[in-house]
A protein has these predicted regions:
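Acidic, surface-exposed loops and disordered segments
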Residues: 2-211
Length: 211
């Protein structure tokens, strides 16, 4: 065989291999749990039961750094945080709100707040909720990645909860408490929920089930 024939066969094989890799790549990416970030996202779950182990200030600082690394509309950063490690205050939160019982046993809770006046005026003011939500998810993921367990407990938009937290933490009127994130070392294993549902996905336009 001529050298040029060998070269053509080699090129064809190379092309075949590249095409195979390219076609199979999205499948591989979808289930790639080798990647630590993807793995942490897929294995995070709400943790509502904690061991007695304390959470160090340096660890809380890392959680807050992760929260403040979140995307934020116009880089306005309207998020504000109140770290609660006072036992009595945590107990009060746990007793006041049925959905936040775990606060009574948590070593620490971070109250994720927003200052709407710090973001865009007018219609854009609602971005504060998205910004504080992005920060909250970052904090949850950081906690999980560091071996902690956490749960997002909703405050805003339930007015009664907003008022109670405002009074409990002496929040000024222009600061809105959005969520109470209880954090601690998990007391046992929790299984992440599988929420994958391809029916929620539409490509290019919304398709009705009959299409
Ligand atoms: C806006 C919001 C409010 C929530 N409020 C509470 C709450 O008050 N108490 C609670 O135990 N969990 C609360 N959760 C956690 C959800 O129950 C939890 O995320 C959901 O059941 C899915 O489970 P997973 O986080 O383990 O994936 C809240 C979550 C979100 C996003």
């Amino acid at each position: 065989m001529k050298n040029s024939t060998y070269l053509i066969i080699l090129l064809a094989l190379g092309l075949l291999f590249t095409t195979y890799k390219w076609v199979s790549a999205p499948e591989t990416a979808a289930v790639n749990v080798e990647n630590t970030t993807i793995n942490d996202i897929m294995t995070r779950t709400s943790v509502r039961s904690y061991s007695g182990e304390a959470v160090k200030k340096v660890t809380v600082d890392t959680l807050l750094r992760a929260a403040m690394a979140a995307p934020t509309a116009g880089n306005k950063q309207p998020w504000r945080f109140v770290v609660v490690n006072n036992r009595q205050t945590l107990r009060t939160i746990g007793e006041e709100f049925g959905s936040m019982k775990m606060a009574a046993e948590a070593p620490v809770a971070v109250i994720m707040c927003g200052e709407p006046a710090a973001t865009f005026p007018g219609e854009g003011v609602g971005y504060w909720i998205q910004d504080v939500s992005a920060a909250t998810e970052n904090l949850l993921l950081a906690a999980h990645a560091m071996g902690l367990g956490a749960v997002w407990c909703g405050i805003y938009p339930i007015q009664e909860r907003v008022d109670k937290f405002r009074s409990l933490l002496s929040l000024p009127e222009d600061i809105i408490p959005m969520a109470c994130v209880c954090v601690g070392y998990p007391d046992g294993e929790s299984t992440p929920k599988d929420k994958w549902n391809p029916e929620y996905i539409h490509y290019n336009k919304w398709h009705s089930p009959t299409e």
